[in-house]
A protein has these predicted regions:
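Mobile amphipathic helical/loop "lid" adjacent to a hydrophobic cofactor/ligand pocket
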Residues: 2-120, 128
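Short loop/edge segments at beta-strand edges and connector loops
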Residues: 3, 163-165, 347
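Helical element adjacent to the flavin cofactor pocket in flavoenzyme catalytic cores
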Residues: 121-184, 188-192, 196
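General small-molecule cofactor/ligand-binding pocket signal
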Residues: 160-162, 311-314, 344
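Mid-domain catalytic core of redox enzymes
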Residues: 165-289, 293-303, 308
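FAD-binding beta-loop-beta segment adjacent to the flavin cofactor pocket
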Residues: 261-267, 318-345, 349-352
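A conserved FAD-binding loop/helix module that cradles the flavin
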Residues: 350-372
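Active-site-proximal substrate-binding core of FAD-dependent oxidoreductases
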Residues: 373-380
Length: 380
């Protein structure tokens, strides 16, 4: 379900001395012009996030990225985005209001802790593809609308899927991976193997000596960002927005009212809001009720009806989610290939020049599949 090509930023009361009252919702409406001009038009029409001087600073500061200088972006991997931002002469208001929520939405990582290259890659992608920043939602839960249809497609073509067999180790003979052994001692033979797991699981499956190889040494060095997915139900609509919303300075850096945006969730006429709560490093040790209370306190800043309309909440804690794009991490991202000719890596942490996301994971899967087909063709 594609949404209007609009980025919506929410600023709580007292966020800035540039205006009184609040909350303020600023919508960046992208035009039908080719990229990057559609985004430039959206920025020029902003009233709160950027003032006139900041619009000029934004254009000049991001110019190397907008013109597609990928090598320039790669040279910024060793510094944080906030450091790069200040070096380019852009304001603190822009950093806190526009880029900080973006950093949390992209990688669940604070703007002071994320690699400048990781952020610049995303900006370059937005600038090079007209609809890159447009949001879309599934028409219902991912398990029902995405995962199961893919699984059914594969089953109809003779593919066996078993998600109940944790892998204990990979099995090798000479320079080939010949299969895997499960925790209960069963073995599976394989012509090719793709490790499609989070980076910390991949590090456990790859032999220690292999992790020293330049092709994959980053697998053992990359860390992961914790995140809490919060699902909150309300007995009436509390938001008039059906698109993604970036919430400044709160535990709601990116959220959406799926009750309005996705009718497949079956909460008609009410609000069902999903939130990526980040950064979650300091929240993991807290109990659910404390976290929900903090979320509701922040929600009240944007949606005055939130507390009185609240019905229930469910939290899903992910201690190790996507790879953490800290300074220096981008150069550690491995490709799909490993030192073993028939063993491949897939996952959002691999180097596909895309942020850690479902889209990035899918791109990595294509790279791994290409490797399998090439290997199979070479053996035929």
């Amino acid at each position: 379900l594609w949404q209007p090509h609009t980025l919506t930023y929410a600023m709580p009361p007292g966020w800035s001395d540039r205006w009184e009252g609040g909350p303020i919702f600023e919508e960046f409406h992208f035009t039908d012009a080719p990229s990057p001009f559609n985004g430039i038009g959206a920025v020029l029409n902003a009233k709160y996030v950027f003032n006139t001087l900041e619009k000029l600073l934004f254009a000049t500061g991001t110019l190397p990225v907008l013109v597609g200088d990928q090598k320039y972006a790669e040279r910024q991997d060793d510094i944080s985005y906030s450091t790069w931002h200040r070096k380019r002469g852009m304001s603190e208001h822009m950093l806190r209001t526009f880029f900080a929520p973006m950093s949390l939405a992209l990688n669940f990582t604070h703007i002071d802790d994320i690699s400048a290259e990781a952020m610049l890659r995303v900006m370059a992608y937005f600038a090079s593809s007209k609809d890159a920043s447009r949001a879309g939602f599934l028409d219902g839960p991912p398990g029902d609308r995405l995962i199961e249809p893919i699984a059914e497609y594969l089953r109809k073509r003779g593919v066996a899927i078993d998600t109940s067999v944790p892998i204990a180790e990979l099995l090798f003979e000479g320079d080939r991976c010949v299969g895997a052994r499960t925790n209960d001692g069963r073995t599976y033979d394989a012509d090719s193997v793709i490790i499609a797991t989070p980076v910390h699981n991949a590090a456990q499956l790859l032999p220690g000596e292999m992790l020293r190889d330049p092709l994959v040494h980053g697998v053992g060095k990359l860390t992961s960002s914790p995140v809490i997915n919060a699902h909150l139900w309300f007995d009436k609509p509390i938001s008039r927005y059906s698109n993604l919303i970036f919430g400044c300075g709160t535990l709601l850096p990116v959220h959406a009212d799926l009750g309005q945006a996705s009718p497949g969730y079956e909460w008609p006429g009410k609000s069902f809001i999903e939130i990526c709560v980040a950064p979650a490093d300091d929240l993991m040790k807290l109990d659910d009720s404390t976290i929900v209370e903090r979320i509701l306190t922040d929600m009240q800043k944007f949606y005055p009806l939130a507390r009185e309309s609240f019905v229930k909440a469910k939290l899903v804690r992910v201690p190790k989610s996507v790879y953490r794009a800290s300074p220096g991490a981008e150069k550690l991202r491995p490709g799909a290939r490993t030192p073993v000719q028939n063993l491949f890596l897939a996952g959002c942490y691999t180097n596909h020049r895309f942020p850690a996301s479902i889209e990035g994971a899918m791109r990595s899967a294509r790279h791994a599949a290409d490797g399998v087909l090439e290997y199979a063709g070479a053996r035929a």
